[in-house]
């Protein structure tokens, strides 16, 4: 009877929107809808491609594993698949101009990887010609589906990892991607490494007697989007034992605030951490030119601003699945007396 099928839940420590259950003939991955947590976003039934399809499968999208020719929309997931040793399973990509990985650029030049165009409006003919075994893309709230690619009968893997609110929760999704690409042992050991490094760094920060207050980001247009207190970034500041000026805020995403509101709260912050995308690195004079109000911040006057130029630095490509790298940067910025963490990887002090 149904009752005697042995299952074993694969224990996940941090991810809140992912459940993995292994059965003898297949694995079920259930993705919780991050925008409506009582509902399921998607259920996948992972069946080894080498085995015949079992007769009685539960409801869900059947994916034959390991994937050997996937279309991967985002550079984050390309980078992860590469780190899992499954690079040859990437058959196509979208948004090539945002993908900094040299191996991907070379693959497209050589013709071993198809350039499927713009992720928002992919080249259907390219995708059809490729016959991929799955398409990995990031879902959006109320996206109203994925248009024509849904009719191709190719499994769509909804990469909702970015909606996890803890950095380790997001990184733990690599275990799902490991199962998809036949790299589960590698993914499990990589995640164990990330987890232990993160915990060790967190402990180092807790032992520090330095306690600096921190504000982040810049205004864009009329609004300044600051990370909510419960967002990934807000929680990272907390794990780095920095006093984040919006720590009390309850949002798990970014919140748009007026400049005055941020200034009232953060004008006296010890450290200011910014990310931007420009041809050349930003300086204090650039900040002043951009918006004179910035010069009123204590961190501007004391020259304690750190910037990450995402045009040159693989911040968005690496940090989702290596939050320990980002935590190490934040700890070195917020606890300058800790001098043996290998130097900054993403941020640097602004020049004049």
Language model features by range: what are they?
Residues 141-151, 276-288:
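A ligand-binding cleft/hinge motif common to bilobed small-molecule-binding domains
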Residues 3-5:
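Short, small-residue-biased leader/transition segments that mark boundaries at the very start
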Residues 196-197, 201-285:
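Flexible, glycine-rich surface segments
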Residues 30, 35-128, 134-141:
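A short, structured surface patch at a secondary-structure boundary
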Residues 7-39, 48-49:
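Catalytic-loop region of hydrolases
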Residues 112, 123-125, 129-223, 247-248, ...:
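Extracytoplasmic substrate-binding proteins
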Residues 86, 152-153, 240-241, 301:
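Short, structured coil segments at secondary-structure junctions
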Residues 287-299:
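Extended, charge-rich intrinsically disordered regulatory tails
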């Amino acid at each position: 009877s149904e009752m005697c099928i042995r299952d074993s839940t694969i224990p996940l420590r941090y991810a809140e929107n992912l459940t993995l259950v292994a059965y003898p003939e297949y694995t079920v991955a259930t993705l919780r809808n991050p925008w409506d947590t009582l509902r399921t976003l998607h259920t996948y039934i992972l069946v080894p491609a080498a085995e015949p399809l079992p007769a009685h499968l539960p409801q869900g999208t059947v994916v034959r594993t390991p994937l050997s020719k996937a279309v991967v929309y985002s550079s984050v997931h390309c980078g992860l698949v590469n780190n899992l040793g499954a690079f040859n399973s990437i058959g196509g990509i979208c948004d090539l101009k945002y993908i900094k990985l040299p191996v991907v650029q070379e693959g497209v030049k050589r013709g071993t990887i198809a350039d499927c165009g713009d992720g928002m409006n992919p080249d259907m003919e390219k995708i059809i010609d490729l016959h991929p075994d799955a398409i990995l893309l990031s879902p959006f709230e109320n996206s109203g589906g994925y248009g024509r690619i849904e009719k191709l009968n190719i499994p769509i893997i909804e990469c909702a990892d970015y909606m996890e609110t803890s950095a380790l929760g997001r990184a733990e999704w690599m275990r799902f991607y490991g199962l998809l690409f036949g790299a589960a042992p590698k993914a499990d050991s990589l995640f164990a490494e990330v987890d232990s490094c993160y915990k060790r760094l967190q402990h180092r920060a807790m032992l520090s007697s330095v306690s600096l207050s921190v504000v982040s980001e810049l205004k864009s247009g009329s609004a300044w989007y600051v990370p909510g207190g419960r967002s990934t970034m807000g929680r990272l500041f907390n794990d780095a034992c920095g006093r984040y000026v919006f720590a009390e805020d309850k949002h798990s995403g970014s919140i748009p605030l007026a400049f005055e509101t941020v200034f009232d709260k953060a004008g006296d912050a010890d450290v200011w951490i910014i990310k931007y995308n420009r041809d050349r690195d930003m300086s204090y004079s650039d900040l002043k030119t951009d918006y004179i109000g910035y010069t009123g911040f204590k961190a501007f006057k004391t020259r304690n601003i750190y910037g990450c130029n995402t045009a040159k630095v693989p911040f968005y490509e690496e940090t989702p699945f290596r939050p320990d790298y980002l935590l190490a940067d934040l700890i070195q910025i917020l606890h300058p007396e800790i001098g043996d963490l290998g130097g900054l990887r993403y941020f640097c002090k602004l020049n004049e």
